[in-house]
Amino acid sequence: TTATGIEVELVAVGEDDLPQLMTVNAASGTLPDVVFHPVDFTVGWAQQGLLDIEAANQVVQNLDPATFSAGALDLATVDGSVAAVPSDGWGQLLLYRKDLFDAAGLAAPDTFEAIEAAAEALHDPGNEFFGITASNDAAAVFTQQTFEQFALANDCQLTDAGGNVTLDSENCVEAIDFYTNLLSNYSPEGIQDVVSTRATYFAGQAAMIVWSPFILDEMANLRDAALPTCDECADNPTFLAENSGIIPAIAGPKGSPAQYGQVSLMGIGTNTNVEAAQAFIEYWLSDGYIDWLTVAPEGKFPMRQGTADNPTANIEAWQTLESGVDRRAVLGEIYGTEVIQGLIEGSSNFSRWGFVDGQGELVAAIYSSLPVPIGIADVLDGGATPEEAAAEMAARAEEEQEFLTGG
């Protein structure tokens, strides 16, 4: 950067390709100085020796741990030290056609019961309208992320506090059964992924969608590459934004409201240019921070919430940022302060599998091998019952666990 005098080469990598690339680079001794990555991989990489924990922890100390989201630091902690530096995050959302829900007298879809009731009531495949659209692609992390929110909502956990895999628990079987029934009965046919689910909702062909908040600027007609195409959108491009409700957290019959959260961090590769990496990250999270959040405020909530002098400075600045690509607007002016406040409050209560039980390395493994999306697809294809899929998911997770522990 100009400010630090450090020359930076930016290499863009797809999220699904990260695990393999880090392994290849580790083998060839070419780990990146700084790797921007989702928390799914942080603890696993640290325990594999791919991240310089001491270097990252020093950055957090230099910037003051109290200025970061405590939850984000907890997710990235290994043996009492922060393994990578939290940058930003987002919480997954269930969006729904509030106009159609209101007209049908349906409750907001914040529980399994309300979600299924609405999907059944509004599903009309003969007119190309579906109760819900959500990911079912066996090869996509997006399916893991989507299902995990439903699992967490029903208190279906990856492991118990003792580290025993619990994917075959009654709660997990129930979550698998609910999710697959929802998609089998009330969703479009075929493989659904991050692109097709958005396209279906934007075409006005679905009552509900599960997606990240990156959809918010697109739904507000701010990005030409992903424009709403519903019939009403021709005359009113912001029709969907005006008529969609937003649910951050959902609850199943055996759980309490939960929201899947994704935190992005900056890790420092082992045996790399550590001092330059530390200087770059400290600049990124101070003088360069708001410029970074401006890239996509709808999906980049600040995990460094402020400074020692003003603990909420970055949150306050974030609320004023304009989102969009081809057009720009402040999200609060489109969706209202209540929605924005919900996004802010949710950022401190994100839920995830495994991390609080010290299973970050196992999380990294299953996000790489994807036994859960594969199991979901097996049920949808008729190749397994929810009970069989849960047992297979658990068995594959246990195999990963045994490999990691040398058992």
Report each predicted region and the residues it spans.
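Short amphipathic alpha-helical coupling segments at ligand-binding clamshell hinges
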Residues: 6, 174-178, 272-284, 389
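Extracytoplasmic "Venus flytrap"/periplasmic binding protein-like
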Residues: 3-68, 99-110, 200, 207-208, ...
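Extracytoplasmic/periplasmic solute-binding protein
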Residues: 81-87, 116-164, 194, 198-199, ...
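C-terminal lobe and pocket-closing loops
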Residues: 219-220, 236-238, 253-370
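A ligand-binding cleft/hinge motif common to bilobed small-molecule-binding domains
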Residues: 42-46, 213-238
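Glycine-centered hinge/linker elements that transmit conformational signals in sensory
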Residues: 119-121, 162-191, 235-249
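Short glycine- and hydrophobic/aromatic-rich loop-to-beta-strand nucleating segment
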Residues: 92-96, 151, 266-268
